Amino acid sequence: TGIRPQGKEIVRTWLYYTLLKSTLLMDKPGFQNVWIDGLGMDPWGRKMSKSLGNGIDADSVLECGAGGRTGAWRVKGPDKSVQLKANKIGSECFRLWKACDAQVGDDFHINPEEIESKYFGVLTKIFNIARFASQFPIPVNFNDVPSNLCAGDQWILSEFAQVLEDVEKGWREIDIFTSTRIIKNFATDVLPSHWLEMAKGRLYADDRNAAWTIHRIVKDLLTIFSPICPFFTHHLSETLYGESAVDVRNYPKSLIVNGDDAVRLRNLTGFLCDFNSETWRAKKDQGLSLNAEIEGVTIPAVLSEFATELTAMHKLI
């Protein structure tokens, strides 16, 4: 067996007994790795027990949202009972929460309201990215990299190359927390908030390079996310690409060489995100919509290679 999952409260009993028994019977350990998880706590950080009346049934959390059913839980707190409510959670959101909210060995608070508010939106954002990508032509050959990618496409592919590398390292080390956090951060921030906003105009103008870029990233993103949310990623990948993100034989490999130029582009990410945020803030301060033209904004020299895309994105005049 490759791994034995268990709670930390039975290390000196079941873990030691199992190791002793397997050694006596087979003269070798019964498993290679031990996954020692933390304990589920109530919203106030206390262990759940019948005597405290603070237990939350996991099945009721998993079923929250199924068939339109909402969830409600009365939990006894230190001072008074509180009513917790949620509308949509389900198994995929539950898995994402467990993978992303605590590192291995750490205790974790079980609060359905927080699970929904912090993680259902992550799935919604990834779903919306995939739905947005579905509007544009799917490449005939995902492995055929366009020869004249613009600076913005090269930048996001360089970012994604590092994501692929770091997530694979996490999976190999059974570091589910780190891998999931990396995917979450990329899929909810850099990709939609910055690159997609830069690329929308080109996508709507039938730019084949932009279409190749978004589909290549979405397809591989669903694959590396499938160990956490298999049903969610299977549905999206089957719908978009006619194949399951779960049914893969090899980990996705970046088609962009993760070398010096990729590092140089990634070093511009902070400047790029800061410039976008400052420009959006300037529009808000002037009472302008984000789609409105704006004067007096200068693109910094360090971002000169993105000038055409940033000018179109922010409607700079």
Where are these regions (language model features)?
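A short glycine/serine-rich beta->alpha loop
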Residues: T1-E9, K80-Q83
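Active-site rim elements
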Residues: R4-G7, P112-E113, L265
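Short, conserved micro-motifs enriched in small and acidic residues
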Residues: P5-W14, W212, P227
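Short Ser/Thr-interspersed hydrophobic loop/turn segments at strand-loop and sheet-helix junctions
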Residues: Y16-L24
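Feature 926 captures the class I aminoacyl-tRNA synthetase adenylation module centered on the KMSKS loop
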Residues: L24-K80, K85-S91, E114-I317
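Structured mid-domain segments that build the active-site/substrate or prosthetic-cofactor binding neighborhood
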Residues: R95-C100
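Short, solvent-exposed helix-loop connector elements
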Residues: D106-I115
